[in-house]
């Protein structure tokens, strides 16, 4: 292997190409810095006035220092990229591509423009990643325990996506097969989610419209909210938290059940279009509330309330608890209606 330290190019580039492992401690170039090796380890501080590019056929290890480019910063590894107590900074874009990428709690990635992280296997983030424009993270398994911030768009895409940290963008898109959120997923504008199964005890929210598509199960004990309209489409919904769309709420599902302490609310209109509905807790709308179901049941402690009109259409309606409307209430049960409220 090649072990180098304190490399300086005051009037040009630094180019390093090793057939074996390459280890460099401290480098400075007014131009570009390029490092290639069978494996690459960088310690200390590395600064490029131009692009900074590191590529390895195996692993890249970054520890206890900084990588700083006035232009683009690019890391490409055939194996793993490891970031330990390391700060990456780019005047333009940052790109990380590897089979596995890990970032510890003491590390940061900052770019004036875009940040793209692509892991063909696992991506684990525990530190802070901040993009002046767009942030994109994709992996087969993405475990996000840190802070991801984008001043423009943030997009996460993974087969398995686990978030216990904070993700925030001016707009936010989430794509996965299974998604678990015990942290926060926030958008300053619209939020779009497309997944099979979504489990959350944290907070998912947007100032703009929220569109959620869960082809399997959605289970929430946390907050799922929009200051604008919220549209939720799922196979099965278990709602034991807060589900709210300030300017409208629409839920379409095969089954919907809400728990005793749940709040399902819109300041505007609400439509529940569900085959089988079992409601407890609070279900309320400032405007018209419509429930369209094959089978509807409300528990003794359930509150079904509308600031204007309440419309219930079902084949089988079994109503307990409170049903109330400020204006008109219409209950249409084509086969069976029981009321014990």
Q: Predicted segment positions?
A:
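Extracellular beta-strand scaffolds
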Residues: 1-4, 8-15, 20-24, 28-34, ...
């Amino acid at each position: 292997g090649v072990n180098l330290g304190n490399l300086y190019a005051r009037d040009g580039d630094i180019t390093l190409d090793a057939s074996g492992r390459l280890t460099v401690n401290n480098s400075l170039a007014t131009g570009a810095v390029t490092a290639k090796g069978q494996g690459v380890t960088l310690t200390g501080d590395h600064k490029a006035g131009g692009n900074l590019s590191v590529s390895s056929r195996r692993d890249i290890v970054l520890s206890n220092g900084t990588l700083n480019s006035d232009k683009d910063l690019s890391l490409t590894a055939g194996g793993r990229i490891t970031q330990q107590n390391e700060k990456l900074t780019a005047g333009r874009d940052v790109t990380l591509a590897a089979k596995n990428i890990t970032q510890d709690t003491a590390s940061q990635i900052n770019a004036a423009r875009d940040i793209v992280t692509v892991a063909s296997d696992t991506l684990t983030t525990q530190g802070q990643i901040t993009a002046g424009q767009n942030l994109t993270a994709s992996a087969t398994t993405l475990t996000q325990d840190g802070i991801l911030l984008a001043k423009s768009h943030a997009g996460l895409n993974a087969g398995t996506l686990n978030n216990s940290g904070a993700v925030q963008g001016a707009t936010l898109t989430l794509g996965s097969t299974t998604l678990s959120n015990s942290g926060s997923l926030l958008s300053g504008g619209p939020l779009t989610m497309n997944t099979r199964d979504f489990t959350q005890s944290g907070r998912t929210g947007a100032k703009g419209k929220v569109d959620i598509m869960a082809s399997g199960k959605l289970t929430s004990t946390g907050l799922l909210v929009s200051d604008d309209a919220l549209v939720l489409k799922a196979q099965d919904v278990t709602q034991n938290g807060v589900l709210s769309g300030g300017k409208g709420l629409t839920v379409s599902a095969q089954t919907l059940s809400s728990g005793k302490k749940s709040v399902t609310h819109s300041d505007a209109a609400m439509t529940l279009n569900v085959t089988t509905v079992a409601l407890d807790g609070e279900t309320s709308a400032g405007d018209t509330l419509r429930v369209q179901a094959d089978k509807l049941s409300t528990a003794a402690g359930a509150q079904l309330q509308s600031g204007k009109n309440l419309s219930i259409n079902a084949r089988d309606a079994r109503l307990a608890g409170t049903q109330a409307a400020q204006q008109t209430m219409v209950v249409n049960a084509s086969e069976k209606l029981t009321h014990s409220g």
